[in-house]
């Protein structure tokens, strides 16, 4: 099918054919496709002659350098695949130009041999714009065709001074103020990428994401922005800000108090904690489980022989589980027997995180955060893993938690701020987070003490421990503090942690 029309393109593209040993170079996509089509026609003609000699040996292999694709189904699969190589070549050129415009960035350091590895193509590129359903084998022509729909879309009046364009994609009702926004939106339907890394071949939806891909590969001494929550480092403040959104819990389980940052996390929680469905069943016994990983671990128990062996030279250790071999390797061959976990209350050290968990619960009477099944530990500058004392909640979730607390509060409850222990739940302003566990261990305390008015953005709400009828204190994660729009720096967090613990 001929191209549905030219679109503005960047100048001076060096489109180099990588079919076999071909060295053809041009600057226009139309000329590039014509050239590659000749390769395809010659290749397909040769494949037909081989098929006549041996009909059982029918296959369609791609000769693009560093590719290795082979289709046993039809020549149409190969045609779509090779045309995608052409489109990918253009994106890599655009990536090269974007990289050359950033004098402070170094090239990608990932494996150059993956530069021509492209995703599996669909059976066809189908336009689902209303009353269209055009089909293409060439992704370039398909994306241009969809662009034409956006450019020809008529404005609709929703009021006297307000006109919008509506997306005509099947099942979509989105509207936009201008055609450019509609064009960008359509990429979410077509999965179109606009730039690729010239080194590793990775494709991206915009230049910003591509340049982030490069910046993430900077050396450690250039990664000057550190996450105060998990200690990961980043090259730019914006990368850090994007990363920290993944720490903010925006979604709450409707069946318990578990909160999480992503819809996918909530789905997993619902499946593992509130569903009785166990679709993965063992063929050797009555065991069933909720995921494939657990089933594979279980199947190892049916093996009479050790399925896993230590690959260290002259070591004969073997075990029926991979985790046992990994643990053996860390302790015996890596010398990882030194304690890495330290209690933040009494400084006692442990070699394993679950031992510290038992210590915190029995020695210091810590409770898991309501709706959460375990403690989380964070590596500090001295190399020790200590209890993570900060959890970020969105404003909406915090208000929901506070409402539940107020509805169940006991006005006669005696408060004792010296007994405060636990997690600071930082309230973070902003919209929903990006797209992507056991039974509750006691409620968050019922009493609240307000250190300031709730309308004050700097107020802190202390959820303190209560004394039951037997005179036993129930120590829980106890501090909610509302901060400004971004999570606090390390220094501010440390100050609040010390205050929360009464230090």
From Swiss-Prot:
Superkingdom in the source lineage: Eukaryota
Protein name: Histone H4 transcription factor
Record's comment on post-translational modification: Ubiquitinated. Ubiquitination may lead to proteasome-mediated degradation.
InterPro entries: Znf_C2H2_sf, Znf_C2H2_type, ZnF_E-box_Homeobox
Region feature (Disordered): 481-503
Localization terms from the record: Nucleus
Region (Interaction with NPAT): 369-503
GO biological process: cell cycle G1/S phase transition; DNA damage checkpoint signaling; DNA repair; DNA-templated transcription; establishment of protein localization; G1/S transition of mitotic cell cycle; in utero embryonic development; myoblast differentiation
Molecular function terms from GO: chromatin binding; DNA binding; DNA-binding transcription activator activity, RNA polymerase II-specific; DNA-binding transcription factor activity; DNA-binding transcription repressor activity, RNA polymerase II-specific; enzyme binding; histone binding; RNA polymerase II cis-regulatory region sequence-specific DNA binding
UniProt function note: Transcriptional repressor that binds to the consensus sequence 5'-CGGACGTT-3' and to the RB1 promoter. Transcriptional activator that promotes histone H4 gene transcription at the G1/S phase transition in conjunction with NPAT. Also activates transcription of the ATM and PRKDC genes. Autoregulates its expression by associating with its own promoter.
Membrane-spanning parts: none
Organism: Mus musculus (Mouse)
Taxon lineage: Eukaryota, Metazoa, Chordata, Craniata, Vertebrata
ZnF bounds (C2H2-type): 17-39, 125-149, 165-189, 195-217, 225-247, 251-274, 280-302, 308-333, 341-364
GO cellular component term, pick one: nucleoplasm
UniProt KW keywords: Activator, DNA-binding, Metal-binding, Nucleus, Repeat, Repressor, Transcription, Transcription regulation, Ubl conjugation, Zinc, Zinc-finger
SUBUNIT field: Binds MBD2 and a histone deacetylase complex. Interacts with NPAT.
Regions of compositional bias (Basic and acidic residues) in chain numbering: 493-503
Residue numbers spanned by region Required for activation of histone H4 transcription and contributes to DNA-binding: 370-403
